[in-house]
Amino acid sequence: MKDLAFDERGRFVIRDYASRRPFASLLPGIAGPLGIPLWVFYVNRGQAIASFGVENKDNPIMEFEPANRAYQTTPYTGFRTFLKLKREEGTVVYEPFSAWHSADDSQMSIGMNELELQAISAAHGIQTNILYFTLPGEPFSGLVRQVTVTNLGDTPLTLEMLDGMPRVMPYGVDNRGLKEMGRTTEAWMAVFNLDEGVPFYRFQASADDTTEVSEIRAGHFYLAFDESGQGLAPFVDPVVVFGQNTALSAPDEFVVQPLADLCQQRQVTTGRTPCGFFGTSQVLGPGESTTVYGLIGHAGNIEQVRRERARLAQ
């Protein structure tokens, strides 16, 4: 079968994967004797990752959905990449791997502890590669996401990119709370450390129906940087990216505003389900590429993330 093959690295390659019969699988979650494992559930839809978290589905970073629902929701609530492409002939906003760009030439490559996606848009002269793998041997759990955009056109390209997650579940809410009291639990949700460029997502305090309220110090973190190690601007308020488009079908605010203007907007960090996007602007000549590195994971406290940030960017 020409659409199913193994590449030179021994990875199983599925071409045009989103149009195939749906399937679901997991990354191995091996973190080594001193690491902290992360469970990562993926499907052959959208940008593949359907949900992930620590320990079990009651500690999600991306909300857990069973396979039958993940096939439907992953293109919207999974990882998303929005590219604003400006050439001499005009400006367009393009989302690789989306269900409405089915004409793109796409493939999924499945390795032992990695998953890579590729989309080539002949119409826009763009190639997008996304590589996922879990981080072993660290005092925190982490999913690495590497996004590379290549200008396949024969003219220079001015690129603005937003990449990340439309919904990040702060630490402290279980699966039942998300499913049965999702709106109520938003009252406890908060994002800390935004001013330092590494959002830290957790509940402000325990939300259990008990007489005692306990402190929550652990949380989920998200950081991203470019090829030089420079940290990227984070967006945690979905209204800044999507506006009032609660269906998450398109980044309405990013479509109409420059990235620099979005960076200046005030972001609400409490009382709503946050997102996790990072933005960058580049000028790519013909054949040139740019890469963004992201790390999403769980840590015992915010001080641990601050200590490790500089090392991780190297």
Model-based region annotation:
Residues M1-Q314:
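Anionic coordination/interaction segments
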